[in-house]
Amino acid sequence: MGDNNGIVVVSTFDGMSCGQQALERAGIPVKRYLASEIDKYAIQVTMANYPNTEQLGSVVDIVTKSLPFTDVFLGGSPCQSFSFAGKRKGMSTADEQEILTLDHYLELKAEQYEFEGQSYLFWEYMRILTDLRKVNPDIKFLLENVVMGKKWEHILSKAIGVNPIKINSALVSAQNRNRLYWTNIGMEPGGLFGHEQSIIKQPKDKLIFLKDVLEADVDSKYYLSEKAVSRINRSINGDKCFAIESKSLCLTAGYYKQDRDNQYIVHNTMPRSSKTKKGGSGPLSRKDGKTYCLDTGSTNAVEIVAMRGRKAVLTPKRT
């Protein structure tokens, strides 16, 4: 795979180019990295960190015959319609025709159908991967998405040709984030009939908690205003949120030793509920030192730390 100068990577839904970060940390040289992303701020972050990135624009506009011979193909297609927040509707047109195959999607696209949500873009990932496989049958791929209903998980697995691996990012970070990963990396023949199976093991739990990643000295532009603190106090139980005068106090490692000291109250101002037909907002408590999954739908989430004898209010840093 690749040559002495490195591999060629195409990454769809590239975001801030975590794929490049992972390859860099793994010590894998990259000759060319082509990225498909439309968010201007994500692109700015990528180009600041990896100025040699070749930006391709929207995934729907990629002409596969213009792509170079590709060694690795990455993607994390939108998950909203697969998640509870999206009522697990899956992939469909605006008039509720379910899209179960790539051929069907390409027909609908040619006829200029309007699609529901953004999760249908999985089929754009498959369109590109299908063409890249024709040029390089040994191409390595990786697709990430949310844990979804078994129906849609089966459809994605059938299309891509492998079953997913479920990994919770809590094993290697301070955030609970269960995700599915479809990949042909680390596959070996196994079982009675010699079918290829993944040999990728679950990551070792690094025992990283929120207290381990919070910053002690934070720029004043990230402080909560008195108005914001007052609003939060009105929204949740007063005994769980304590206002401070100007900024959050430093959280030392010793705070986790008492019962309430490691209780992070996560106040989400966006509708959130385990029941898809009900919204609602308010404090969601955890006592394991981890955050709830904070994704693009949680940009208004505010994390409150309730500590016996000390008072602090924290907000997540936006980047």
Predicted regions and their residues:
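Conserved active-site and SAM-binding loop architecture
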Residues: 1-319
